[in-house]
């Protein structure tokens, strides 16, 4: 395994570990999800460039578009929750609290 792949896998693992550990605030969860998506984008782009697989050149761009949509939906959810409850705690998102 080359150093680039190992660094990208390490970035993904650290982001996932951050997502599992820092679940109290919605903003930290969104940042960890964004780090995971960016490491997947980097891994996909490097893999496609090293294998010269020209048919899949659009795949990292599609993944980046999905990451941007995820970030937009997450930030709108963050604004809605902070306006409604006054804080961005994830425990406020429980649907059973009516």
UniProtKB/Swiss-Prot annotation:
Gene3D superfamilies the UniProt entry points to: 1.10.287.3510
Main location: mitochondrion
Keywords assigned by UniProt, alphabetized: Electron transport, Membrane, Mitochondrion, Mitochondrion inner membrane, NAD, Respiratory chain, Translocase, Transmembrane, Transmembrane helix, Transport, Ubiquinone
KW Secreted (keyword) present: no
InterPro entries linked to this entry: NADH_UbQ_OxRdtase_chain4L/K, NUOK/Mnh_C1-like
Segments traversing the membrane: 1-21, 30-50, 61-81
Protein's name according to its UniProt entry: NADH-ubiquinone oxidoreductase chain 4L
Similarity comment: family membership: Belongs to the complex I subunit 4L family.
GO cellular component: mitochondrial inner membrane; respiratory chain complex I
């Amino acid at each position: 395994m080359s150093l680039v792949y190992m660094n990208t896998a390490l970035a993904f693992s650290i982001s996932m570990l951050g997502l599992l550990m820092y679940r109290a605030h919605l903003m930290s969860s969104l940042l960890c999800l964004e780090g995971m998506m960016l490491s997947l984008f980097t891994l996909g782009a490097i893999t496609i460039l090293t294998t010269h697989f020209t048919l899949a050149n659009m795949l990292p761009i599609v993944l980046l578009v999905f990451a941007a949509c995820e970030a937009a939906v997450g930030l709108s959810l963050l604004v809605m929750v902070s306006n409604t409850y006054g804080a961005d705690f994830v425990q406020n998102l429980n649907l059973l609290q009516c």
